A protein has these predicted regions:
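Sequence-level detector for compositionally biased, low-complexity segments
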Residues: 1-177
Length: 177
């Protein structure tokens, strides 16, 4: 297990990723042997526990603001889903009523591919319009309002995972290689 944790940590090392970026795109990664094996294994275990057990981590204390959308309510409609993030303000707009704020800058720097984990979640929960009218009429489609509370909880937990992952990877930068 320690070897697996060590490899997981090395593959998350920002210096390793930067130095071997081109190689990582073209071939299988080569794992260097760093002097303090057990420190790297401990970081890898911590990262793995965060990434695998993201549903069990404590939710980050984001401020939630709910302002009723009187227009939508008067028309008998659900709030309009937006699912937009503004990293510069540290806010996430879920719909025309709900905004989460207090997202720390570190949460936006943890990337899964080319997007932050938070942006990835927002993209996955967006309502998509089906092009085929037959399917649209006859089948029950996804509605964000049915999953809103689940998404709020998930965003808070993934914020915790992102912040803690960035803290660990920043500590890796200072380690001797």
């Amino acid at each position: 297990e320690a070897i697996f944790h060590y490899c997981y940590a090395v593959l998350h090392d920002p210096i390793y990723r930067e130095k071997y970026a081109l190689n990582l795109k073209r071939e299988f990664p080569r794992i260097p042997f760093y002097p303090d094996f057990w420190q790297w294994a401990a970081w890898g275990e911590a990262l793995m526990n965060l990434h695998i057990g993201y549903e069990a981590v404590a939710p980050f204390a984001l401020a939630r603001r709910d302002v009723p959308d009187e227009k939508a309510r008067a028309a008998g409609l659900a709030p309009k889903a937006m699912l937009r993030a503004d990293a510069s303000l540290g806010t996430i707009s879920l719909d025309s009523e709900t905004t989460l704020s207090g997202v720390p800058p570190e949460a936006w720097t943890y990337k899964l591919g080319n997007r932050s984990a938070l942006e990835w979640i927002l993209d996955q929960y967006k309502e998509k319009k089906l092009k085929d009218p037959t399917i649209r009429e006859k089948f029950d489609t996804y509605r964000f309002k049915d999953y809103k509370e689940k998404v709020v909880d998930l965003l808070m937990r993934v914020t915790t995972v992102s912040v803690e992952t960035v803290a660990i990877t920043e500590a890796m930068k200072a380690e001797k290689r």
